[in-house]
Amino acid sequence: MTKSYHIAVLPGDGIGPEVMAQAHKVLDAVRQRFGIRITTSEYDVGGIAIDRQGTPLPQATVAGCEQADAILFGSVGGPKWEHLPPAEQPERGALLPLRKHFKLFSNLRPARLYQGLEAFCPLRSDIAAKGFDILCVRELTGGIYFGQPKGREGSGQYERAFDTEVYHRFEIERIAHIAFESARKRRSIVTSIDKANVLQSSILWREIVTEVAKAYPDVKLSHLYIDNATMQLIKDPSQFDVMLCSNLFGDILSDECAMITGSMGMLPSASLNEQGFGLYEPAGGSAPDIAGKDIANPIAQILSLALLLRYSLGADDAAEAIEKAVNTALAEGYRTADLASASNAIGTSEMGDVIARFVAQGA
């Protein structure tokens, strides 16, 4: 009997619903071509949930996600809700609690410069011409963002603020395994990022990553200090395959990787727990200024679906078919407004149609 899967779909705010609609088209094409039994249920999250139910993360949404095999997330937030206390705003009140509730400890952010889009890369043309395909693997639940103690105290010239960087062995081991396993499916190169010349937490990080590497003799490991890594990423991003980072360093480097691709509308992300359950979302925001205008780029949402199929459902063939279809669409000149002049751009919905058609055709 064919196994069936269930996805909790959380479109959210801004461009979320319209780009999610394109992911649904692509999912329909995947079902038909590969015969995978996948059902979906939609739930409110973010600002629309505040408007309808008084909270950015309703209990019904959490319960629906608990019954699912994975979460496909759109985007949340917008000016309408910025007057609320920070903890009640869509971003902090929805996404962070979901990550905590499902113990999502690893964040995977692919950053790729697609052929034909080199002109959008802010790097020098000779660097962009080499292309790059990087996977940033970021530890998501440890480090300085969560370490204790943290706070402020004192007054006058003695007023001070403090945060604490803490990492446990098990936290470093499990994120390192994610990086090495991911590298095996790519070019088998891991670059671990730390500040082991200064920080005790980074010394432990480097020691443990080196130990874990022994279980992956087919994967090449190197280490870079964070300051050098940021420079090397600008100098020659093509040298990197998988970048393994702590929470703070990954936060910085994953955004740097995103920026040098030239369009946030192309970048998916995955956040996973130890059981393979994941939340998949575009790396960009809700872009309320372009919502409802049929000009948003849906590719990040569609590629987030591909990551979901690969990491949570184990459907590598279907994931590769989506990625190939995106490649084909771009190679044949299909562009949304962020990647083209207004005169030759296609809309959000048409881009979804094109990619779904290519998935169905195996193009």
Curated annotation (Swiss-Prot):
Query: Which SMART domains did the record assign?
Result: Iso_dh (SM01329)
Keywords of the record: Amino-acid biosynthesis, Branched-chain amino acid biosynthesis, Cytoplasm, Leucine biosynthesis, Magnesium, Manganese, Metal-binding, NAD, Oxidoreductase
Q: What residues bind NAD(+), as annotated? A: 78-91, 285-297
Single annotated GO MF: 3-isopropylmalate dehydrogenase activity
Q: In which pathway does it act?
A: Amino-acid biosynthesis; L-leucine biosynthesis; L-leucine from 3-methyl-2-oxobutanoate: step 3/4
Reaction catalyzed = (2R,3S)-3-isopropylmalate + NAD(+) = 4-methyl-2-oxopentanoate + CO2 + NADH
The cross-references to PROSITE patterns, in alphabetical order and at most eight, read: IDH_IMDH (PS00470)
Q: Which GO biological process annotations does it have?
A: L-leucine biosynthetic process
Which residues bind Mg(2+) per the record? D227, D251, D255
The record's comment on cofactor binding reads:
Binds 1 Mg(2+) or Mn(2+) ion per subunit.
Cofactor(s) required for function per UniProt: Mg(2+); Mn(2+)
Classify the main location: cytoplasm
**Which compartments does it reside in?**
Cytoplasm
A single Gene Ontology CC annotation of this entry is: cytosol
Q: Which chain positions carry the site (Important for catalysis)?
A: Y145, K195
Q: What class of enzyme is it?
A: oxidoreductase
Q: What is its EC number?
A: 1.1.1.85
Residues annotated as binding substrate: R99, R109, R138, D227
The record describes its quaternary structure and partners as: Homodimer.
NCBIfam families linked to this entry: leuB (TIGR00169)
- What does this protein do, in the record's words? Catalyzes the oxidation of 3-carboxy-2-hydroxy-4-methylpentanoate (3-isopropylmalate) to 3-carboxy-4-methyl-2-oxopentanoate. The product decarboxylates to 4-methyl-2 oxopentanoate.
The UniProt family comment states: Belongs to the isocitrate and isopropylmalate dehydrogenases family. LeuB type 1 subfamily.
Name of the protein described by the UniProt record = 3-isopropylmalate dehydrogenase
Query: What taxonomic ancestry is recorded?
Result: Bacteria, Pseudomonadati, Pseudomonadota, Gammaproteobacteria, Enterobacterales
